[in-house]
Every structure is written in structure tokens, then in C-alpha cells.
Design a protein with these regions (language model features):
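Noncatalytic, basic helical substrate-engagement surface that gates or grips nucleic-acid strands
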Residues: 1-129, 133-155, 159, 233-236, ...
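Conserved RNase H-like, two-metal-ion catalytic cores of nucleic-acid enzymes
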Residues: 3-4, 8-53, 69-70, 74-81, ...
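Non-catalytic nucleic-acid-binding/docking modules located in mid-to-C-terminal regions
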Residues: 50-53, 98, 121, 140-144, ...
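Active-site-proximal helix-loop-helix substrate-binding element of RNase H-like nuclease domains
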Residues: 152-176, 183, 322-448, 472, ...
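Conserved "right-hand" nucleotidyltransferase catalytic core of DNA-directed polymerases
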Residues: 230-338, 347-356, 413-593, 609, ...
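Function-dense linear segments that define catalytic or interfacial modules
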Residues: 360, 366, 378-407, 411, ...
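Conserved catalytic core of nucleic-acid polymerases
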Residues: 453, 561, 565-566, 570-573, ...
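C-terminal polymerase-core module
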Residues: 472-479, 483-534, 702-750, 754-756, ...
């Protein structure tokens, strides 16, 4: 029998510390539960075990603590955020049918050793999944350790251990007894490190063998002294480090075969934890009808034909096969392609829908605007909980306990749809988010649908030629690198690149990882002056990314109409920003000359011009308004260059004396303040000492005193409420602020400072998009809104409409809100995006 045994504590710790803090909308921590399930699912998929045991440590002291008071004495307690997840995870595993095992007085390691030995005795094979290298001593021909590392899971068999350490698996106990283990506070022999311990065990076989050969010339005099003086510690360490194989637990492998568990309870718990994709991975059904059916029978409803003259309110949603249905009371109507478009703009009809954007696509394709749509449950769910990873009607119905009124085989989620939309509407009203939905998010969904439908024209031949030139450049750069290093190697292999730079060329290594030398961008940047090869490697990486991600990616996405139709996502960013995918048009490079050339291949259609409008320093203007800082407001009101004005104020010099370097420093501080950067990060950005950066920050905050006060208030209010808000009332939960982990808490504080500003900027550009789109239609123009990138809008307009469109963009973007500091938009035109911006 193939038995998989998980070291529960080791793996749950890796999950907790390896994944950013996640919470449900009601503040329950979930990252460890989420990560542990992914680890378990991946192990099951990769190894298909016959039985699975999950071993846990108990809180009670073990026999090792009794033998040595200092055992694990340096360990910190479990973080509160993880401790809260443990009982939930264990209950979920029980509901999923997994057998868990623990024993007071024994560690999970001993359970792993006991189960592996017992299974081997019956002729079985065992896989031990852990992140703890202590378990490597258990490896033999029948037992393999699946060692979880930061990047991958490494199968460790006897050959792998011999290759890595130069000893057999059981000899690792002997090594530890000499070198000790700081993580478990096992003392070892003071002054004997890993290298020496390995050498001694390789020569003498064991701890006992070392002490039997203390007079051997291979043992240096100082080493001999340490060994003689600390023999008792070494023998104690040997006992502490040896994993026992006789824990008093059930050892029959059959005992650990997975049971049926309680699928309904597991599905319900996963719904409460908002882990909908994992529900699907476990093969569970969490649809409201399925959950309800487990408790009581529901009346079965057969779909009907939509009335020829529909009126009143209907609730619309989409089945998994893409078909649409409507619910009115206890009636379900399947909507075909003939009836659906007319329903979306029908007079006397109000439609509450789940996911409006595809419906707006249909309406626009048929000459309508989806005027009957009055509410979108998906957008409401996003506004209520922007941290969720997915928004599906069936999953949300389970999450919000929206009970189904009936069952319908043709539309499994239909029975709970109206109840779900009711509860989402009520909760959004209670949160004060109704206006945000109706005036911004819902009309924006229509705008995004139109932008997706229209697309952006590109010069495909120009992109192909650009790709050819990049390939030629890459080949030349590659040959230069080979010549500089002296041989050919795989430049995309970090290991081979590290060997070339640090072993062959002799460059000073900056960082080392478990896999070898670090060759990340930061490391290479610090080595530029040592060899021309480094500069070429950085250039090679830049060109390769341009070619694979942008050139080849854009050509793949090109539609038959010669335009690229990106997908705009409204429910992804926690700050409220819109994102773009397939392809991501918001990430087209602009900071480098070569990267910005790509924008030159985004073109206006024949006879048309691109009109590009970009907000000027919108986030700083919001900062000046939101903080009420008179000095900052005055700088904007006077029309000054804000960065130059800031430099003049903090350096106490006339603006005319501000150099480019001083302006750059002021710009870094202006934006650094918003993003919560401290002296260390700012110093790194500016290439100055931490002390100098700290002086800059203090001077800045003295110059703009209300900025610092506002930032501190943001953090305090967020800690009190558990969330921050934009000026439009958009909420972002910040569970990170309650973390006991300093780094996580600091990250939460940075988000508390920045989100009200960045989120308000996102809201402003969204509202501007809605107003611009509507005004173009109201004035019956042929011009069309094509793209939004951060604070920039791009419109494609016929030549005779360009001046009118320029005026519309400027007016609507600048007048969308009325703040103490006016918003300004800079407008340009051109035949390409590069030229227009």
C-alpha cells in the first residue's frame, strides 16, 4: 500500500508564511487553510496514494522537553492569525474524509517515523510530505521524503541524500548530534559546524565512531578539545534528534484510507471561507439547490416561455454552459438569442442581473444600451468584498445563505437567484454603496463592454518587423555574452548563469539562495561596473520580455478585424482600479525608448485620429485636497510645478534655484509619502544614505504638516473600523492591520495610507469614463472611447470631430468632481498612441 503522511504543522506553517494574509468578508483569516489545501491537492494529484495520514503536534510537552528543558525553547509561539485557522482547517479535513493523528507527549515527526516503519513492515511504500529536513533521516528504499521548499517539492530518496550530504540517511542523526540544530535549540558540540560534522561522520561513520577515534590525526587538536569537553551534550543531542518509530498510535495503513466524510458540511464550510475554486477542485457541489436538497426536497420547476410582452421585474443570470435564464417569482424562463436582446431594452421592464457586462455586449451589438438593467449582483458582491478571488452566483448564494425557493434542472442556480440579489442589495444599502453601484460601476460595465467590442487597431506588419529586429538584436547580444564569458551556456538557467558570472568571470556574489547564486535584477544591477557581460545580460532580459510578452503576445491577440480586443476586468483590484487582460494593454512599456516604440504600433483607423487625455498628478492633487494642507494646495492653485515647488519649500531656496536632482528628490518624496515609504526605501530609490533620507522625510513633513497628520489618522481609523474608504465611499477591508506579524501589519498601514488616494483616483477616472462615453453619444459623434490606462483615456475620432472630442475630454475629466484643488487633464492627438500621448 502506498501511504502518504503529511507533517501537518510543518506544511501549515509553510502555507501561512508563504501566502499573504487572506480573510473572508467578515474578517476570518484563511491563508493557511487555503495554502494547506493546495499543498494536499497537489500531492494527491501527483502521487495518487492509497491512504493519507495527517500528523499534528500536540501542545503538551514531549519526552524531549522532559529530557532537556531547553528543547525548542527559542521557538516563538504560533501567530494568533494562524492559531485561529487551525481548528477550522482540522474540521474541514475531517469533513473531507481525511484521517488525522496526534499523540500527547509525541511529536508529528515521531508519528511520521512510526507510520513509515509500520508500513514498510507490511511491504508498503511511504511518502512523507514535510518542510522539515529532520525527517530525511527516515529515508530508505521504502520511504521517500517529499521535501517542500520555497520553489518546489523535492523527492528525497537515499541516492539524493547521499549526493547532497555525502552520508546515508540514518547518518544525518549523527551529523546533527555534532553540529546541533538552532531551530530546535539542540546544542550539539559548541564550535562544531555543519562542514566539520559532515566530514567527521563521513570518515568515522557515527557519533560513537568519532569518540572511538579521538586520537586520529584527522581530528584537529582544537576539535578534540571541544569533543572531549562536550561529550554529554553530543549524546543528549543524539537522543533529541533521533526520530522515534514506536509512537503509541494506530499503525495499520488501512486505518488511514480516506472516508466519505461529510461532503455537504465541507461544501458549506468552504463557502463560508469563500474558497469557491477549491470547492470545485475537491469535486464538491455547493449550488444552493444541492445543499438544500440534502436537507429537504424542493419543488421542481420546469422552464417556461417568456411572455411576448414582458413587464415588471426579472432576475437574470447565466448557466455554466453560457445560456441565460430569467426568474420572476417561481417561474423560470430560458432566454434564446432572439428574445434576450429585446428584453435588455424593453420598456416597462426592470432587470436585476448577475454580471451585466456580457449583457451590455449583447445589447450594444443589437443597437441597444441595456437600459432595462438596474442592478448587478456581481458588482454588488465586489463592492461588499473586494478581496474575494472570484464571484459566482451559486457560490455567493451559499456564502450569503440565500436559500433556494425551488429547484430547476435547466438552471441549477435559479432557485436562489432572487434571494441572492435581495440580500446583496440589502447589504449594499446598509454599507452605503448603492450610489456607487448605480452611478459608477453599473454604467461603467456598459462602457467597458463597448471598449471590448470596439478594440484598438494595430499595425501588425510594423509589430512583426519590430519583432524581427528584436530577434536580431538578441542574437547579437547573446554572441557578445558568450564571447565575454568564454563559452556557450543556457542564459535562462539561473544556475548556469551564476556559474558563468561568479565562477568563470569571478564577479563578487551578492546573494546566495538554496539553489545557488542569485542572479535577480537587483543583483545584476549592482554588478554592472564589474563586467560588460552584466550589462548585456540585463539588455538580453529586457529584449526577451519585449519579444515574448508584447510582440508575440500582441500578434496572438490580433482579431480578424485588425484590432486587439482586450478584456477589461472590473472586479479584481482591491483599490477599485480596472485591470486588463488577454492582452494586458495597461502594461505596455513606456519608460524605455525601445519599450515605448510599441505604442507606435497602436494606430488610428484610416481617416481617424487618436485623442489622448491624461490627468496631471491626480493622486497628489487628491492628497492636497484630502489632507487640507494649505501649502500643498497653494502650490497647485498657483499653477506651479508641484515637484519643483516642493523642492523649493523643503530646501528653503527659490524655485529658480531648484536643480534637476533636487526636483527628482522632491518627486520621490511626494510619491513615497503616499505609498508609505520610509527612510530605508526612499534612500534606496534616491541612492542616498538612510540618514539623509530620514532628514528629507522629516523636513517634508514639517513643510506639509497636515499630510503626516492625515496619514496617521488614516491608520488609526482603519484599525478602528477594519477598513478604509475612498472619497466616493468605496471600502477596502484591511485585516493586515490586526496581524501580530510586524511586516504584515506594516503592509496594512501602507495600504491604509495609500488606498484612500489611489482608490479615489480610480473612482474619478471611472466616473470620467462614464461621462465621456455618454457625452460622445449625446452629441451623436462617431468618436469612440478605446482604452483607459491608469489616469489616461484614449478616444478614436474622425478628423472632423477631433476638436470637439478634445473639448469633451478636457471638460468631463476636469469637471467630474469639484475639489479644493482643481483637476487638470492634458490632451494630445496623433495617428499613433505614441504620438498622441
Amino acid at each position: 500500500m502506498k501511504l502518504l503522511v503529511l507533517d501537518g504543522n510543518s506544511l501549515v506553517n509553510r502555507a501561512y508564511f508563504g501566502i499573504k494574509l487572506l480573510t473572508t468578508k467578515d474578517g476570518r483569516y484563511t491563508n493557511a487553510i487555503f495554502g494547506f489545501q493546495n499543498i494536499l491537492l497537489n500531492l494527491l494529484s501527483a502521487h495518487h496514494p492509497d491512504a493519507v495520514a495527517i500528523a499534528w503536534d500536540e501542545k503538551a510537552p514531549t519526552f524531549r522537553h522532559t529530557a532537556y528543558d531547553g528543547y525548542k525553547a527559542t521557538r516563538h509561539g504560533m501567530p494568533q492569525e494562524l492559531a485561529e485557522q487551525m481548528p477550522v482547517l482540522k474540521q474541514l479535513l475531517t469533513d473531507l474524509g481525511f484521517v488525522q493523528v496526534s499523540k500527547p507527549g509525541w511529536e508529528a515527526d515521531d508519528i511520521l517515523g512510526t507510520l513509515a516503519a509500520a508500513n514498510e513492515a507490511t511491504g508498503g511504500t511511504t511518502l512523507l510530505a514535510t518542510g522539515d529536513r529532520d525527517s530525511l533521516q527516515l529515508v530508505d528504499d521504502a520511504t521517500t521524503v517529499l521535501l517542500a521548499t520555497n520553489r518546489e517539492t523535492l523527492p528525497m530518496d537515499p541516492a539524493a541524500i547521499q549526493e547532497k550530504y555525502g552520508v546515508a540517511p540514518p547518518q544525518l542523526i549523527e551529523v546533527k548530534s555534532l553540529m546541533g540544530d538552532a531551530s530546535d535549540n539542540i546544542p550539539g558540540v559548541p564550535g562544531i559546524g555543519e562542514k566539520t560534522a559532515l566530514a567527521l561522520v563521513q570518515k568515522f561513520g557515527s557519533l560513537q565512531g568519532v569518540y572511538e577515534h579521538l586520537d586520529d590525526k584527522a581530528i584537529k587538536p582544537k576539535q578534540r578539545e571541544k569533543l572531549e569537553a562536550n561529550r554529554e551534550l553530543a549524546e543528549l543531542s543524539h537522543m533529541l534528534g533521533t526520530i522515534r518509530k514506536d509512537a503509541p498510535i494506530e499503525t495499520a495503513p488501512e486505518h488511514y484510507c480516506r472516508t466519505a466524510g461529510d461532503p455537504a458540511a465541507a461544501a458549506q464550510l468552504l463557502a463560508e471561507l469563500e474558497m469557491h475554486k477549491l470547492t470545485a477542485r475537491w469535486g464538491l457541489d455547493e449550488s444552493p439547490a444541492a445543499v438544500a436538497a440534502s436537507a429537504e426536497a424542493l419543488p421542481e420547476v420546469q422552464p417556461d416561455l417568456l411572455p411576448l410582452a414582458p413587464e415588471g421585474r426579472y432576475d437574470l443570470a447565466q448557466n455554466k454552459d453560457g445560456s441565460w435564464y430569467a426568474v420572476q417569482g417561481d417561474s423560470v424562463y430560458l432566454l434564446d438569442n432572439d428574445r434576450l436582446p429585446s428584453l435588455l431594452d424593453a420598456a416597462g421592464v426592470q432587470l436585476r442581473v448577475f454580471d451585466a457586462k456580457p449583457l451590455y455586449h449583447i445589447a450594444l451589438e443589437h443597437g441597444g444600451v441595456g437600459a432595462a438593467i438596474v442592478f448587478d449582483g456581481k458588482l454588488a458582491a465586489y463592492l461588499l468584498n473586494p478581496s474575494a478571488s472570484d464571484y459566482q452566483a451559486g457560490q455567493l448564494a451559499a456564502e450569503y445563505a440565500a436559500a433556494p425557493a425551488f429547484a430547476c434542472a435547466a438552471a441549477p442556480d435559479a432557485g436562489a437567484l432572487s434571494a441572492l440579489l435581495d440580500v446583496l442589495s440589502t447589504k449594499l444599502d446598509e454599507q452605503g454603496g448603492h450610489d456607487l453601484l448605480v452611478t459608477m460601476e453599473l454604467p461603467l460595465a456598459r462602457v467597458l463592454a463597448d471598449m471590448e467590442r470596439i478594440g484598438f487597431a494595430v499595425d501588425a506588419e510594423g509589430i512583426r518587423q519590430f519583432g524581427d529586429s528584436l530577434r536580431a538584436e538578441l542574437n547579437g547580444i547573446l554572441q557578445n555574452i558568450y564571447a565575454e564569458v568564454g563559452y556557450e551556456f543556457n542564459l535562462n538557467s539561473p544556475k548556469q548563469l551564476g556559474e558563468a558570472l561568479f565562477d568563470k568571470l569571478g564577479l563578487p556574489p551578492r546573494k546566495k539562495t538554496a539553489r545557488g547564486y542569485s542572479t535577480d535584477a537587483e543583483t545584476l544591477e549592482s554588478l554592472r561596473t564589474y563586467s560588460p557581460a552584466v550589462d548585456d545580460i540585463l539588455k538580453y532580459r529586457t529584449y526577451s520580455k519585449l519579444l515574448s510578452t508584447y510582440v508575440e503576445g500582441l500578434l496572438k491577440a490580433l482579431g480578424p478585424d485588425g484590432r486587439i480586443h482586450s478584456t477589461f476586468i472590473q472586479t479584481e483590484a482591491r483599490t477599485g482600479r480596472i485591470s486588463s487582460t488577454e492582452p494586458n494593454l495597461q502594461n505596455i512599456p513606456i519608460r524605455t525608448e525601445l519599450g515605448s516604440r510599441l505604442r507606435g504600433y497602436f494606430v488610428a483607423a484610416p481617416g481617424e485620429t487618436l485623442v489622448d487625455a491624461d490627468y496631471s498628478q491626480i493622486e497628489l492633487r487628491i492628497l492636497a485636497h484630502i489632507t487640507g494642507d494649505e501649502a500643498m494646495q497653494q502650490a497647485f492653485l498657483s499653477g506651479a510645478d508641484i515637484h519643483r515647488a516642493t523642492a523649493a519649500k523643503i530646501y528653503h531656496i527659490p524655485e529658480s534655484d531648484v536643480t534637476h536632482e533636487l526636483r527628482t528628490s522632491a518627486k520621490a518624496i511626494n510619491f513615497g509619502i503616499m505609498y508609505g515609504k520610509g527612510a530605508f526605501s526612499l534612500g534606496k530609490d534616491l541612492g542616498i544614505s538612510v540618514k539623509e533620507a530620514d532628514t528629507f522625510l522629516k523636513t517634508y513633513l514639517n513643510t506639509f504638516p497636515k499630510v503626516d497628520g492625515y496619514m496617521q489618522n488614516c491608520i488609526e481609523h482603519a484599525k478602528e473600523k477594519g477598513y478604509v474608504e475612498t472619497l466616493f465611499g468605496r471600502r477596502r477591508p484591511l485585516p493586515e492591520l490586526a496581524s501580530s506579524n510586524f511586516q504584515v501589519r506594516s503592509s496594512g498601514e501602507r495600504m491604509a495610507r495609500n488606498t484612500p488616494i489611489q482608490g479615489t483616483a480610480a473612482d474619478i477616472i471611472k466616473l470620467a469614463m462614464v461621462h465621456v462615453w455618454q457625452r460622445l453619444r449625446d452629441e451623436k459623434l462617431q468618436a469612440r472611447l478605446l482604452l483607459q490606462v491608469h489616469d489616461e483615456l484614449i478616444v478614436e475620432a474622425p478628423e472632423n470631430e477631433v476638436e470637439q472630442v478634445k473639448r469633451i475630454l478636457k471638460e468631463e475629466m476636469e469637471q467630474v468632481v469639484s475639489y479644493s484643488v482643481p483637476l487638470t487633464a492634458e490632451v494630445g492627438t496623433g495617428k499613433t498612441w505614441l504620438e498622441a500621448h
